[in-house]
Amino acid sequence: MSSGIILLIVAIVLLVIIAYLVGVIIRKRNDSLITSLEERKQALFALPVNDEIEEVKSLHLIGQSQTSFREWNQKWVDLTVNSFADIENHIFEAENLNDTFNFIRAKHEINSVESQLNLVEEDIASIREALNILKEQEEKNSARVTHALDLYEKLQASISENEDNFGSTMPEIDKQMKNIETEFSQFVALNSSGDPVEASEVLDRAEEHTIALGQITEQIPAIVAKLEDDFPDQLDDLETGYRRLLEENYHFPEKNIEARFQEIRESIRANSSELVTLDLDRAREENTHIQERIDSLYEVFEREIAAYKVAAKNSKMLPRYLAHVKHNNEQLKDEIARLSRKYILSETESLTVKAFEKDIKEIEDSTLAVAEQFGLQEKPFSELQVTFERSIKTLTNVESGQMDVFAAVKDIEKIESQARHNLDVYVTQLHMIKRYMEKRHLPGIPQDFLSAFFTTSSQLEALMDELSRGRINIEAVSRLSEVATVAIANLEDLTYQVVQNATLTEQLLQYSNRYRSFEAGVQSSFEHALRLFEVENDYQASFDEISYALETVEPGVTDRFVNSYEKTREHIRF
């Protein structure tokens, strides 16, 4: 053979070997793909879809939910019966084609199987999701129904246990319960007939009505208890107490108490009858009005009971107090009469005592007999309390006024005695002041002193005249005595001032001799001051003139003389 042929043969052999090797590699790769597809198929087939279907089926779906479930269940059946079988056939065909090295057709079958598995996988996911939605929805609906039924059953049990607490409302409550029961039956019928929307609305209404009725039944017993127990008990208590108070001679300003009892009982009956409408707000409001009317009756009785205690106490005190005040007034009248024989008294005291007597007489005429016959009175104790308290207040004011009048007249004799004593003292002081001035040997007496002296003397004479009368005007005596006291004190001060000015002026005039010869101002003031001193007897002006002149030449000299005089000044010996 030629070398060319040999090379050709070798090349062909190499090509065959290479082709074989390539075929083996492709076959193994396809086997791997086919195995992977088989595993995917088995994994999909092994999903717990059947279990999930059985779980949803056990929920006993109805209506639209049941229809939807059947559709998804049928889709699963189609997948298991048709799709999986078709995939199995295509996998088997791909294996045969791959084993016979028909790689192109094998690849086509592999691609076809892969596409089918993708579709099946999506369908299974949709089926499982739909089943889960159906399950959740059914569980939710079931929970709603269960919750609503539980509410209804609890309400029914509560009403049965407390039937006696609902009074006249029981027929209406039974009617409402039957209406709710009818709504539940309507819900079941609509749900079974495949109308879930309407069924849901009916269930909502049933639940709302159950809750509303439950809230109403919680409030009714308290209202009924008021109408059937509390109010009747309170009325019985009031009527019993009213009869007992009447037996104990109580009387009341209100004359319609029996009628008010009857009106309240009628209101209780009317409210009980109206309560069947379950208008609880109106019933509570009416209960409040009834309680207010009952409370007002309690207040009437409690007022009279409290008034009795006060009036009974005051009825015992009033006669004694009246006698005491009357006795005081008689004593006061006697004292004023005694004093009036010697003294001219203010008309105020007499008029006041007469006013006291009038007040006492009015109480004696209008209230004393009522107090003394307290147990036989046919008036409300509250009125008697007001009457007694008003009378006691009047007597208190009278007694206080009596004390004021007594305080005003009790010291009249002391006032006279003190005035006489003061007069004697003041007359003596007036004489001593006169002698004190005479002993000073002054050039003359200043006019202001003379005016004060004679005015004081006149005031003492006026007081003496008043005390000499047959009936002394004690007010005038008191006034004149006060005026005399002030006048004698002022005269004493003026006396000391006149004597001091005169003495100091004499001393300063003598002292000024030191400066007169060489101080023209001092000489001039000396002459002026001397004229004021000896001629005009104006000792104050004379002192001011000479002291001013000396201060200009010897500051402080005046104070030195004044201080020295005050230490040695002679006092009036009273």
Swiss-Prot record:
Chain segments annotated as coiled-coil in the UniProt record: 102-141, 274-350, 459-520
Transmembrane segments: 8-26
Biological processes annotated in GO: division septum assembly; septin ring assembly
Key words, A-Z: Cell cycle, Cell division, Cell membrane, Coiled coil, Membrane, Septation, Transmembrane, Transmembrane helix
Residue ranges, Extracellular side: 1-7
Family matches, as Pfam families: EzrA
Residue spans, topological domain Cytoplasmic: 27-574
KW Protein biosynthesis (keyword) present: no
Cellular compartment(s): Cell membrane
Membrane topology designation: Single-pass membrane protein
One Gene Ontology term, aspect cellular component: plasma membrane
InterPro entries in the cross-refs: EzrA (IPR010379)
Keyword Electron transport: no
Domain of life: Bacteria
Function comment: Negative regulator of FtsZ ring formation; modulates the frequency and position of FtsZ ring formation. Inhibits FtsZ ring formation at polar sites. Interacts either with FtsZ or with one of its binding partners to promote depolymerization.
Alphabetized HAMAP family for the sequence: EzrA
Family, per entry: Belongs to the EzrA family.
Name listed for the protein in its UniProt record: Septation ring formation regulator EzrA
Lineage start: Bacteria, Bacillati, Bacillota, Bacilli, Lactobacillales
Gene field: ezrA
